[in-house]
Amino acid sequence: MSEKVLFIDRDGTLISEPLDNFQVDSFDKLEFKQDVISSLITLKKFNYKFVMVTNQDGLGSKNFPYKSFIRPHEFMIDVFLSQGIKFEEVLICPHELKSGCQCRKPNLGMVQHWLLNDMLDKQHSCVIGDRKTDMILANNMGILGIRYGTKQGNSWSDIVFKLTKKHDRHAKVVRNTKETNVSIEVWLDKQGGSLINTGLNMFNHMLDQIAVHSCIRMKIISSGDICVDDHHTVEDVGIVLGKAILKALGNKLGINRFGFALPMDDSSSYCLLDISGRPFLKFRSYFKHQYIGDMSSEMVRHFFQSLAFAMKCTLHLRSMGINDHHRLESLFKVFGKTLKQAIVVSGKNLPSSKGLL
């Protein structure tokens, strides 16, 4: 599962860089940059992870003893931790420029493992630093670079604004089992351009109703044992779609949380949705036939149950009517319309008196 990661320089970006010897080798030289802690706390709420990447010229040499470095460094880490800021890794190159090593920024040696196996969400990750070498590193990694610096670059407040002002609520979740391979991406703030292929034509059509009526974009690719039946495919797509929506919602700050809808055709359906963090499904719908197209009618309830529990939401669904196709379609339409209401960001705070969803 790819992650949104900020690769952050240390000296000159997180803390001040001493002008005498460019070494933070004593406690009296340790000075945090303005707004850095509050900014990282905010960025954490937007599901960013942090990796510290720093060149420490000659670390461990007579001119820069490791003991002088590690004490203020560990104190700095402890201060960040006390505020809930955790660095997934602290990557340090101890070599001087003349060594020609491959780990020194802007070379990729220290970060190479982050570029493997889709670990990194490149569209939403970036390098933050005060030097040109940090921007070259970003280019070498194929991600955004943001130059920090109160004079020629951005302040921490500027950086937060840039990374959150057009926050694209996007997520990708992959689930591979011996029965199915399911990959789902969702964009909660983009509309149209959905791609859905589950191997089941009716199921594809129903999932498209969710995308269209919730005004979100979905890319759903699934392959599996539909030669046996549709059970595992429908179930696993429900699980992965629920997880993807939940992940894309992020910290849920400002969302409406609740939604309800009651559309009418020759079939009527209603849906009540609460993105509550408490999974529950109440489902009432009956079908005359075992199959609707190539989809088992008994799997309709199971799909919404799988989705609700993976999304950690409370979901009530009911449909009435004569035609099985219309009743089925109305359930997916009404869920899409209800989801659209619930995921809209209309405020800034978490919509919960408990402070937790």
Swiss-Prot record:
Q: Residues that bind Zn(2+), according to the entry?
A: 93, 95, 101, 103
Q: Where in the cell is it found?
A: Cytoplasm
Q: Name one GO biological process term.
A: L-histidine biosynthetic process
Give UniProt keywords alphabetically. Amino-acid biosynthesis, Cytoplasm, Histidine biosynthesis, Hydrolase, Lyase, Magnesium, Metal-binding, Multifunctional enzyme, Zinc
Catalytic-site annotation from UniProt: 9, 11
Location, primary (coarse class) = cytoplasm
Segments of this protein annotated with the region Imidazoleglycerol-phosphate dehydratase: 169-357
Reaction catalyzed? D-erythro-1-(imidazol-4-yl)glycerol 3-phosphate = 3-(imidazol-4-yl)-2-oxopropyl phosphate + H2O; L-histidinol phosphate + H2O = L-histidinol + phosphate
Q: Please give the residue ranges the record annotates as the region Histidinol-phosphatase.
A: 1-168
Q: What is its EC number?
A: 3.1.3.15, 4.2.1.19
InterPro entries reported in the protein's UniProt record: HAD-like_sf, HAD-SF_hydro_IIIA, HAD_sf, His_synth_bifunc_HisB, HisB_N, Histidinol-phos, IGPD_sf, ImidazoleglycerolP_deHydtase
Q: Which GO terms describe its cellular component?
A: cytoplasm
Q: Does the keyword Mitochondrion apply?
A: no
Q: Which residues cross the membrane?
A: none
Which pathway does the protein contribute to? Amino-acid biosynthesis; L-histidine biosynthesis; L-histidine from 5-phospho-alpha-D-ribose 1-diphosphate: step 6/9; Amino-acid biosynthesis; L-histidine biosynthesis; L-histidine from 5-phospho-alpha-D-ribose 1-diphosphate: step 8/9
- What Gene Ontology molecular-function terms does this entry list? histidinol-phosphatase activity; imidazoleglycerol-phosphate dehydratase activity; metal ion binding
Per its Swiss-Prot or TrEMBL entry, what cofactor is needed? Mg(2+); Zn(2+)
- Which Gene3D superfamilies does this one have? HAD superfamily/HAD-like (3.40.50.1000), Imidazole glycerol phosphate dehydratase, domain 1 (3.30.230.40)
> Which residues of the sequence carry a binding annotation for Mg(2+)?
9, 11, 130
Note the HAMAP family from the entry: Bifunc_HisB, HisB
Family in the record? In the N-terminal section; belongs to the histidinol-phosphatase family. In the C-terminal section; belongs to the imidazoleglycerol-phosphate dehydratase family.
Q: What is this protein called?
A: Histidine biosynthesis bifunctional protein HisB
Organism the protein comes from: Buchnera aphidicola subsp. Baizongia pistaciae (strain Bp)
